Amino acid sequence: MKSYGLSLTTAALGNEEKKMAAEKARGEGEEGSFSLTVEEKKALCGLDSSFFGFLTRCKDGAKMKTLLNKAIHFYESLIVKAEGKVESDFFCQLGHFNLLLEDYSKALSSYQRYYSLQTDYWKNAAFLYGLGLVYFYYNAFQWAIRAFQEVLYVDPNFCRAKEIHLRLGFMFKMNTDYESSLKHFQLALIDCNVCTLSSVEIQFHIAHLYETQRKYHSAKAAYEQLLQIESLPSQVKATVLQQLGWMHHNMDLIGDNTTKERYAIQYLQKSLEEDPNSGQSWYFLGRCYSCIGKVQDAFVSYRQSIDKSEASADTWCSIGVLYQQQNQPMDALQAYICAVQLDHGHAAAWMDLGILYESCNQPQDAIKCYLNAARSKSCNNTSALTSRIKFLQAQLCNLPQSSLQNKTKLLPSIEEAWSLPIPAELTSRQGAMNTAQQSVSDTWNSVQTASHHSVQQKVYTQCFTAQKLQSFGKDQQPPFQTGSTRYLQAASTNDQNQNGNHTLPQNSKGDAQNHFLRIPTSEEQKIINFTKESKDSRSKSLTSKTSRKDRDTSNICVNAKKHSNHIYQISSVPISSLNNKESVSPDLIIVDNPQLSVLVGETIDNVDHDIGTCNKVNNVHLAIHKKPDNLSASSPSSAISTETLSLKLTEQTHIVTSFISPHSGLHTINGEGHENLESSASVNVGLRPRSQIIPSMSVSIYSSSTEVLKACRSLGKNGLSNGHILLDICPPPRPPTSPYPPLPKEKLNPPTPSIYLENKRDAFFPPLHQFCINPKNPVTVIRGLAGALKLDLGLFSTKTLVEANNEHIVEVRTQLLQPADENWDPSGTKKIWRYENKSSHTTIAKYAQYQACSFQESLREENERRTQVKDYSDNESTCSDNSGRRQKAPFKTIKCGINIDLSDNKKWKLQLHELTKLPAFVRVVSAGNLLSHVGYTILGMNSVQLCMKVPGSRIPGHQENNNFCSVNINIGPGDCEWFVVPEDYWGVLNDFCEKNNLNFLMSSWWPNLEDLYEANVPVYRFIQRPGDLVWINAGTVHWVQAIGWCNNITWNVGPLTAFQYKLAVERYEWNKLQSVKSVVPMVHLSWNMARNIKVSDPKLFEMIKYCLLKILKHCQTLREALVAAGKEVLWHGRINDEPAPYCSICEVEVFNLLFVTNESNSQKTYIVHCQNCARKTSGNLENFVVLEQYKMEDLIQVYDQFTLAPSLSSAS
């Protein structure tokens, strides 16, 4: 870190001597500048980003805002006087202050300066949280997600973890990553800490998430469960009833259409009883009345909708449809014009308007309307519109020009209609609404300078910044509506494309302003279109302001990139590369590829919980660091080498509050090591006097367990480490950037390493093993393996499988049959990365029947094609001409059978015995296979799985679980085509997934080879024939498709190498940061390896020993903290073949000390929680018992006995 003359300690919190000296040095220039009294400094010292959204809950919230403004001027004046040569804490604190005043551009600027000056910025959770809030405000969701995930990674007990989970839930929901969204909503729901949303509001969003996923019965059950809650807030109840009404109108939940509409109307009427001013409920009610033919009631409801809320393009479009049904074309025209003037991109209104003109025999105007509809990004039937436009144009060409000119028009042309006056009720209503909103908005945002933001975006921000009803005083009304109201109304604006009566309208911009967060369903592939205008302004503001303010002082700036889903991706780039467009990196903050940090705690007493504060002190120890010139992430190959393995352990001082403190998590203090205390200053910006800083603890992996535990005890009765198992000195995990220099284009299709076996001796030749596990070979194809070893592949044929176990379960993935290596959207209009496949289950017998029928059908189709050769050449030329632009849709549906478990030795004895003929390094079980030391079966990893395929069946892109190697043998009779990308390019594919709103780890995706070629990503491509074995090396990315009818068997292998262990642990930590379960329990496995294996490779030994050291310390400190808090630890030893325990809430591995609810313990179900989730559920752990699976003496013995074994060469 760069250290300068003026420190935050001197400016705000230093001792009197330092302050007097500083004041004397400043001399007369201090006069006339802003100054802070001692009391004001004390009031400010505890404020950081964790108060965002909670400041108004203080008794003196208004006075605090005034003080914040004063403090900002004070700090800025000091920075000016020091010519910018101040310590980094100034900028971090300025960022916090500006954030609390909602001046986001200034907050971002200050945070950027802090980042550029502070080398280990990632240790400061409050900084990361504030940065995430700013990115969230600017709708830079991918950046906000990264920042929030890093907060939870470095500090799982961060006091605003619940707020983070809420925001992550919303962002993943907007990105259509519903599984991740649900997980974070559930994590927020179990947290008992204070939050800006109540538990019932969180439950509502979980219910709506089910609805968005089209899990309507689950959504209905969740909504009805909410209605059973006594004293349910009126606004929540109204919105729940609204959603139930709309679902009954749209979905086949019960009975016939008449019954559906009756229930829908009843629910909506009840909703209006709770909230008669809900324009959305009135609109939905109008739709229901229109559906059953109650025209007058529908008109009345639509009128009420316009009166109760902002004018909506949806409403006016529906009114137009109603007029058109009543044969009132002029009134319908006027309503449609209102709709498209409110939202120029309202595809449904343009289509309905085109239908109206066409019905009035005005094809020219109809064509214009259809063209506007087709240009709209919300249009989902472009192909049908295009066909209709061509048909009408052909008709016009056949008509004489005179007939067109002399024809009487029933309606004004589109140009004339556009100029007609809008109904007075619309203009007056819209003008009054905008005026009122602007007035309230200006009052509330008086402290902001970003006045250019739209009303829509201000509402959006206020909701998500926790300025809901609870944030205001009893007599003070929030601007517009409360946060909960906005949250609920946002979710209630549902998909309206499911009623078949007419072409349905989409939400207009006006409607988006009223309901800031339009939640689309999976059918609508137009994610967050409602925020496009605000994103334009915010992204431009973000770029211009930061570049203008920080161009000379920061090494990063913000660059907005627009992507196809209309979300602006923000990229962080070095200032020096601004003029080089090719050097822009997609990373949020460019850092080295991470390992991990363990945080050790110390007790702090007298914790205050008055207003749900964050009881956390940010101790920034300002040691001198040299900022690396190149911040680009290194590849994983070098990320955890022996050079970076620190054998001398320097602990971060991650201090925690007392272990048992009610209504609070383990509120932490983020500290940093004191490399140079003489030239650095420890700054306390917390609410209370700074706690005693824990001295650095230095132990080596070669230290005995006695020395390790003694060093732990020397820290006193400390708190808890976070259980990470890599290094302390590196930031949170990050995907690697693309290797540099990039490969030339001619090397992007490299030849696949292949080995041809002629006999059994070749298969057992030792260099074959070394060739396969060499990190330079991402994949190896061993040709002719089955023949060389005389394997009976017929044991795995479909016929034999049916005879052996015909009722065995098969997981089926229903997919679309795509052309060649491409992946098109269902309409066949564009290539996409998202690969749709739905999961179900069947039996081997039924899938075998499907496989056989598919083959017979293919034979029939082939015969039919041969008989239709007369048009073959024409069809061929047409297809080749269009191959690059579109594909004929709809695509045929096929089914792929996967994850067929062959682990049961009793059922599959012959099959499993046959595989023992394989060489040891590819066997399912062997001493040199790490997965054989897990101690229990992990299906598909240390056991065999089988896939049954038909042509076109695909396994989407992925890396193996925890980056282990993979073995795949093609049984035949058909071939498979493989696509493989080396491990060090997985970061590039992760970026592509993010740009396409996909989760690299959890989503189904099929890469576009053209995108990879443009990004200079090499792709190995080869055919796997029957009897060939494909070895996928550690971390290799791959995707596969069948080009014939075939079966495959597969399992994972873990070579006993440092490279394999390193990648496995890196992925373990990346999974933890991404809130994804690691299938392989690396902590449990590491201890078993120490028990069972003699390791002679120094690199591998050091990594395993380091893991043992970290976990031994974690167990010791956690156990001592529990005992000191009076919490009894009960013995609960492990049994043979017992799976490693995982937290039932967050799915992280839990080692040794298990937190189990009292109820679960008494029922012997043992539902496990990790310490973090246990404390969030029950602040003082009163509802939990702690079970211990290993005696500390046993762990100590394993640790001491695990030593570096002599290598074979040295032994000889």
Swiss-Prot record:
InterPro entries: Corepressor-Demethylase (IPR051630), JmjC_dom (IPR003347), KDM6_GATAL_sf (IPR046941), KDM6A_B-like_C-hel (IPR048562), KDM6A_B-like_GATAL (IPR048560), TPR-like_helical_dom_sf (IPR011990), TPR_rpt (IPR019734). The keyword Repeat applies. Keywords: Chromatin regulator, Dioxygenase, Iron, Metal-binding, Nucleus, Oxidoreductase, Phosphoprotein, Repeat, TPR repeat, Zinc. TPR repeats lie at residues 88-121, 125-158, 165-193, 200-233, 245-278, 279-312, 313-346, 347-380. The modification Phosphothreonine is found at residue 752. GO terms for molecular function: histone H3K27me2/H3K27me3 demethylase activity; histone H3K36 demethylase activity; metal ion binding; RNA polymerase II cis-regulatory region sequence-specific DNA binding. Fe cation binds at residues 958, 960, 1038. Residues 530-539 have a biased composition (Basic and acidic residues). It catalyses: N(6),N(6),N(6)-trimethyl-L-lysyl(27)-[histone H3] + 2 2-oxoglutarate + 2 O2 = N(6)-methyl-L-lysyl(27)-[histone H3] + 2 formaldehyde + 2 succinate + 2 CO2. Residues 530-555, 865-886 are annotated as: Disordered. Residues 907-1070 form the JmjC domain. This is Histone demethylase UTY. It comes from Mus musculus (Mouse). The gene is Uty.
